[in-house]
Amino acid sequence: MTDGKLSTSTNGVAFMGILDGRPGNPLQNLQHVNLKAPRLLSAPEYGPKLKLRALEDRHSLQSVDSGIPTLEIGNPEPVPCSAVHVRRKQSDSDLIPERAFQSACALPSCAPPAPSSTEREQSVRKSSTFPRTGYDSVKLYSPTSKALTRSDDVSVCSVSSLGTELSTTLSVSNEDILDLVVTSSSSAIVTLENDDDPQFTNVTLSSIKETRGLHQQDCVHEAEEGSKLKILGPFSNFFARNLLARKQSARLDKHNDLGWKLFGKAPLRENAQKDSKRIQKEYEDKAGRPSKPPSPKQNVRKNLDFEPLSTTALILEDRPANLPAKPAEEAQKHRQQYEEMVVQAKKRELKEAQRRKKQLEERCRVEESIGNAVLTWNNEILPNWETMWCSRKVRDLWWQGIPPSVRGKVWSLAIGNELNITHELFDICLARAKERWRSLSTGGSEVENEDAGFSAADREASLELIKLDISRTFPNLCIFQQGGPYHDMLHSILGAYTCYRPDVGYVQGMSFIAAVLILNLDTADAFIAFSNLLNKPCQMAFFRVDHGLMLTYFAAFEVFFEENLPKLFAHFKKNNLTPDIYLIDWIFTLYSKSLPLDLACRIWDVFCRDGEEFLFRTALGILKLFEDILTKMDFIHMAQFLTRLPEDLPAEELFASIATIQMQSRNKKWAQVLTALQKDSREMEKGSPSLRH
């Protein structure tokens, strides 16, 4: 006996005659069911669950898929019966609506044959589980064979789990009787045919799109099992039928008509695949503006034409077909906003292009002037240095900046070599410095005769200070630090100088001067220029920390400060801002630490020509450039600003400001004022005993 619950999307169907069926596997042993017996097919309306007879299937299981009620057809113990029957329980007639049986289909009937003893001994097994809905449920049972009517063949389909993705199609059919098909997106199809020796064919579980292919695979599989198909007799050709082909194609056509497909393989509408250029062209055609022909050089933009990109696609793109159309007023408003955005973008791009064009023109002009200057320096000035270096033409070229390719050579010639240092002397000083480093690292106490006046502690302190200062020299370049390409060269020059001038030793700030020389000269030539540069009166006064001479330089600076910038000078005096607060760092490093490197090199160019006077003239030029800002600051902010100048200080503006500074006071030049102050300082020291200490 086979019991079960089954419901469709429209009617509940009571049926029987299903054997052991599992999705994906052939169902066997259909011969245990007597399909010749009369059967009754009834379909009640939607309603509550029908109470049937007490002989219920105790083996039916609930589905494991989210509590979906299932049709459980398992493999219980054999139940002997002579036929398979469907009958309504008499005791529950009042509980079942009468209209539930008014739509029952009366199938063609005939006199049922008497069941044989063999048929009574045969057993019926329950089939596997099929999903179904929770709308209706019908109990299937078979009490006796007398309550059944005759029906040669039956085709029953139940399906449609409306709340889930899976549904079931159970088919028991032949060619001339009822054939019902109810499906959803996925279905499990069981096809059953009865004949003298009925059998199940196959069970498949697939989606609606795969049903057609699976039916064909089933037919191929059945063709291989020829012996089983021969048993089915004239009904075997029914297996080639595709019950879902019509619905399948209809649904696919319906999906393809839609423009938006979220979950599927249907292609989007053609409008969604337009690119921005095509949309822009269509917009220009609608607006009546002729589109420009494509340029042969598409990568080169001529006349700074603006090409809208993502903005065009966002604003001018039509709405999807499933959304309401954009009102005309809103569309016009968006079009106006789009045109305004394009105009603003054109203005910004035009302004940026003009700025870039100006920068490019300036760069080309500078490069061209540098190229011409290199030819002039190499062909005219350097071969005739002694006669041309003080000429008006050379001085003008000097003010504009020395080309980097000849800068080192010009610096060497301008600084000179009054100390007569040779490359051999540099090698001797370097070897002595390396020996001293080794002796200090091994803890040796050997002191040479010429260094007897300097303790080992002073030498060790100088070496440690060199090591510390090198790590802080142009840290942004990362070429003088440990492991950098110029670290050893800088270390060698500073170490050799401490051996060459032990009376001076190493002073903070020397590393920046030596680093700038290394960037433009070879190691030996850089050492020669470094030693002669530090031997100048101003540098020697500062590096030897000659306090009296330093004050004299500061006093001379204030004379020209008051002459050129009286308003700012009075403001500095009012706030007690003395020159030593900002001048010491500028003079010690020759502006290489305070200004950008390329700007500092230009200052070095003129410094090599004009000497120490240009260092103080440059200081006055910086003060004049920022005069308006400094006059609004107090003492603290002025000191902070001058000790840390802006990094983007423009070179041309600075040199224009320096050019306005007149290094003449009361018809006296820098050297005359400095000499007079030095003379006065000596006289004051002689006349005032307090100044001697």
Curated annotation (Swiss-Prot):
InterPro entries: Rab-GAP-TBC_dom, Rab-GAP_TBC_sf, Rab_GAP_TBC_domain
Chief place where the protein resides: Golgi
Compositionally skewed regions (Basic and acidic residues) per UniProt: 271-288
Region (Disordered): 108-130, 271-304
GO molecular function: GTPase activator activity; protein kinase binding
Residue ranges annotated for the Rab-GAP TBC domain, each copy included: 401-611
GO cellular component, one term: nucleoplasm
Cystines in this chain: none
Keywords, in A-Z order: Autophagy, Golgi apparatus, GTPase activation, Phosphoprotein
Cell location: Golgi apparatus, cis-Golgi network; Golgi apparatus, trans-Golgi network
Biological processes per GO annotation: autophagy; negative regulation of autophagy; recycling endosome to Golgi transport; regulation of autophagosome assembly
The organism's place on the tree of life at top rank: Eukaryota
Phosphoserine carried by residues: S91, S295
Task of the protein: Plays a role in the regulation of starvation-induced autophagosome formation. Together with the TRAPPIII complex, regulates a constitutive trafficking step from peripheral recycling endosomes to the early Golgi, maintaining the cycling pool of ATG9 required for initiation of autophagy.
Subunit structure of this chain's protein: Interacts with ULK1. May interact with RAB11A and RAB11B, but does not exhibit any GTPase-activating activity toward these proteins. Interacts with TRAPPC8.
Protein name: TBC1 domain family member 14
